[in-house]
């Protein structure tokens, strides 16, 4: 028979497992459209600094894609950032799903517009020297055809590598 502390620990463990299961289901149900591979050379390998960097990147990306009115309504890019090789070669794999917006509807090619915005942001925020790392931009920005395979690749080092401070799975509008 379990004592009070044992029952409480068991209850907390069940709660965490249930939340993790719901999170995994939400991630797998999302139809991810793009992946950004973002190497962070010459960056301090402190996790909170890297998370703040990704937060700035996502805020700027949302401002480039959505109007102020859409942002006030809660429209934003859905993202799943995962940090890999935190201490040796820090880099993020970010899955994106971009809901329709006024600016996107006025562009003839949504993918080309988003790719240009992402590459401009990487350059303007001095995240990495793109012409050295990926001169053709084929590794930095990728269109996804297999969303579940991309999630599997992103989570290959485990769920603890997810940057939960910057995860956005649904719009709040």
Predicted regions and their residues:
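A short, contiguous, amphipathic alpha-helix enriched in charged residues
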Residues: 52-74
